[in-house]
Every structure is written in C-alpha cells, then in structure tokens.
Regions:
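Tryptophan-paired
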Residues: 1-12, 79-166, 197-204
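Short, low-hydrophobicity acidic/polar segments
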Residues: 1-64
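Low-complexity, Pro/Ser/Thr- and charge-rich linker/hinge segments at domain boundaries
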Residues: 27, 31-32, 162-175
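Intrinsic-disorder/low-complexity, polar/charged segments enriched in Ser/Thr/Lys/Arg/Asp/Glu/Gln
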Residues: 53-55, 66, 125-127, 167
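Hydrophobic residues positioned within well-ordered beta-strands of beta-sheet architectures
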Residues: 56, 67, 140-142, 170
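Short helix-to-loop capping/linker segments positioned immediately adjacent to catalytic or ligand/cofactor-binding
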Residues: 56-57, 76-78
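A short, Gly/Thr-enriched small/hydrophobic beta-strand-prone motif that recurs across taxa
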Residues: 61-74
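Intrinsically disordered, low-complexity repeat and linker tracts
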Residues: 176-204
Length: 204
C-alpha cells in the first residue's frame, strides 16, 4: 500500500526529429498490481517567442483534474477501531496526455489512492490527488480493510466528470462501517473549477 501523496508519470521517449504531436505522458503502473498511481498537477500553455529575446508570459491552463474524497459515518459517529484501512479506486481515467496538445487520449485505466483517518476517526480522507481527465461518470470504488481480514467493497458512478481544471470533492457517507493558487515567474495559472459529488452507502 502507498501514501496518498504518491504521484508518478511515465515520461515520453523524445527522439530527435520526431514531432511532439505524436508523443504523450502516461500513467505509471503500481508494481504487482493492475492499477495506476495518481499523477502530478500539470499545466499547459503555448507561446510563440524569439528564443533569447522575448520573455515567457504564457497563460497556463490546467491539464489534470483534482480529486478529494471524504468518508464519514452517516450518524456522525467515529469509525470503528476494527477498520484497518481504506482506499479508493477511480476508474475510466484516460491513460495518456498528449505532450503537444495536453488532450487526454489512449485507453481508460483505474487509479488507486489511500484514505487516512483523522485524529477522532470521524472521517477518512485524502489530500487532493491529480489524475488525467476521465470519461463521463467515472466509477468510484471504496475498499474497507477490516483488522480481522475481511474486505468490504462498495462502488457507484459519479454524477460528475473529472475534466481538466476541475477540482472535485466526493463526500461518501456510510451506514455502519484545498489547493494553493499563484504564479511562477511570468506565468499565470487558471483557477480550479470546483465541483462536488455525494454518495450514500446503505448498510447491507
């Protein structure tokens, strides 16, 4: 298992004379698993300049989506100490991001990241992770590992799409069991477009 802050990318192979239009950044697979790491927060911009003469003043647009998950008990109680850990799978995430256009492409994959309990165990959550954009209504799955070895699993499609530049908070309520902005040099980064999704998981 890995930390919520882990992020990785598969860099393109750059070949002299090859067009960047034909290259892409890719997801990096978690070793000995079928899922992938979250990615780094990526921005994109173009500007025609004279190298060595013009200053870079490009307007940067976010090329990734941010996702945060907050899991609570429906009744507001603390989660049981019998819960060992929780983690999230988010599916239907594009596998690649074109290096030239920053457009998502390729097949769809599943991203995995962990949830951490707060001090009073009233919620399990993560810092926002970055992912490549998704297809509409991606599937989210929550896994609850019990200390007795049992593994509970719930899944549901989101009502929102993880598009580039969106910052989505998913609130999961169970029966029973935010980002800095600013500039870098002469670059201005677009603000996140924030959205929310709520899921209620009934006790079975």
């Amino acid at each position: 298992f890995f930390n919520t802050t882990d992020a990785a990318l598969s860099d393109p192979t750059l070949i002299l004379g090859e067009k960047l239009l034909d290259t892409s950044l890719g997801l990096r697979k978690v070793p000995v698993d079928t899922v992938y790491y979250p990615v780094h927060d990526l921005v994109f911009g173009t500007q025609e300049i004279n190298i060595g003469q013009d200053d870079l003043q490009a307007h940067l647009i976010r090329a990734t989506a941010a996702l945060g998950v907050i899991t609570t008990e429906t009744n507001g109680n603390a989660f049981s100490e019998s819960i060992d850990s929780m983690w999230i799978y988010i599916s239907n995430i594009y596998s690649n991001l074109n290096y030239f256009s920053a457009q998502p492409e390729g097949t769809v994959k599943t991203i995995r990241f962990g949830l951490i309990p707060n001090a009073d165990r009233k919620e399990f959550s993560n810092k926002f992770v970055s992912v490549f954009p998704s297809q509409p209504n991606p599937m989210i799955q929550v896994f609850v590992q019990m200390k007795n070895g049992d593994l509970k699993h719930y899944q549901q499609k989101l009502t929102t799409q993880l598009s580039a530049g969106t910052k989505t908070t998913v609130n999961l309520s169970m029966d029973g069991v935010l980002l800095e902005e600013g500039g870098t040099g002469g670059f201005q980064v677009d603000q996140w477009k924030e959205q929310n999704d709520s899921i209620h998981i009934p006790l079975n």
